[in-house]
């Protein structure tokens, strides 16, 4: 069994593991081209599709991820995800503000942890996020961590965080063109990019206890690299995200984009540790519909996910 303090620690780590709480605004572009937005990530689909990932931390495998896109009525889509992580070194990954939020020294907590993260979000026909829910479960810990959020048509976002007796809720009025962006876990596609393209992305976390919760990232498409994927060589564009506009600083995050806009690799640096998502080739032995049924069954077993399950069945 984990100590009770670890349950509180999961509340912080949930935002890192599932990453639904990172809000980003696409600012005016540096060049004439518009930056890739939600329309290039999730577009209305007629058929169910899925993407699987292998997760590496500092070149060691630590887990896997699966996301399934389910088409809905009137051009809407639902995105289901499952993130399974094993033996994560918390001392290496926790942000500096974790101790402040927990009220204790994070270095005294358990050195590693296993967890399952379940996510669900709905996106309208315009590519705008309407609601999201997440659950994080840890083996040996009875209480699950629940994250949920809604975005109203007038751009008011409400985020709730709950685990046992602990509850936290915050609301923000966001400017126009804000969208939820998952910074750390992988996005499947980024269509319409070209060499030399640049744009800026402010990252905003409503749970970070700081007076300056917004951080500007500078994105650029610069460089090619040939990757070996699905038994063939693929030429990719490299998209880099930096905390400064010049290209001399090492990137905080990079993505390798294939010729059809598919993201083949997603690498992020978290407090000196390298987190890498490697896209898996399509497994023809299990269809996307079967994967969707499987991932929904996992959600239904997760504590408190019955609300989402009942909504989907209606």
Spans of model-derived segments:
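Acidic, serine/threonine-rich low-complexity disordered tracts
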Residues: 2-155, 161-172, 192-314
